[in-house]
A protein has these predicted regions:
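Flavin (primarily FAD) cofactor-binding/catalytic cores of flavoenzymes
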Residues: 1-70, 74-81, 153-164
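C-terminal, flexible cofactor-proximal segment of oxidoreductases
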Residues: 53-164
Length: 164
């Protein structure tokens, strides 16, 4: 205290850290095959390569969490509106020819908190160019997510397969 007095503690709580998990540890399957998110690439920090119709929100690590949630929600609405307009049922981010040789980077760069480092091996990789980035910067996200076209060549739109 500023006065120099001390207050005895009744209890001291020590924490070893938060353990994050990927998407709530829900088992996702695509065409019967389990998805290993560590083998995917992050698409704009909100979707996963070769996983159709899935968008998730992970807020900013250095700004308001809800700020990014709003950006992702806006993108999701634009994506759904595009699908309705084009009559497509699946939106799947896929690596293009020019993306094949990308240098892999951690899902989130330059954040050393233990809770993040302990789970980084479970998360998708980040590339070295858009749209395969998770920049964690609102100015970059506004260009890459809010202002860029939905049909950017990496997001593939298809009609649902007929059930046999």
């Amino acid at each position: 205290l500023k006065s120099g007095a001390t207050i005895e503690a009744d209890i001291i709580v020590t924490a070893t850290g938060l353990n994050l998990v990927t998407l709530g540890e829900i088992e996702f399957k695509v065409d019967g095959n389990e998805v290993d998110f560590a083998q995917t690439w992050t698409y704009k920090g909100l979707a996963y390569s070769d996983v159709p119709n899935l968008v998730s929100t992970f807020g900013y690590i250095n700004a308001s969490w809800t700020l990014r949630a709003d950006v992702v929600a806006n993108y999701s609405c634009r994506l759904l509106n595009h699908m309705k307009k084009t009559g497509t049922q699946q939106a799947t981010p896929r690596l293009r020819a020019q993306d094949q040789g990308m240098k892999a980077r951690p899902w989130i760069d330059d954040f050393s908190a233990g809770y993040m480092q302990r789970m980084m091996h479970l998360m998708p990789r980040q590339g070295d160019h858009a749209p395969w980035l998770n920049p964690q910067l609102i100015a970059v996200d506004k260009q890459m997510i809010v202002k860029s076209p939905i049909d950017d060549g990496a997001m593939q739109f298809t009609k649902a397969k007929a059930l046999v």
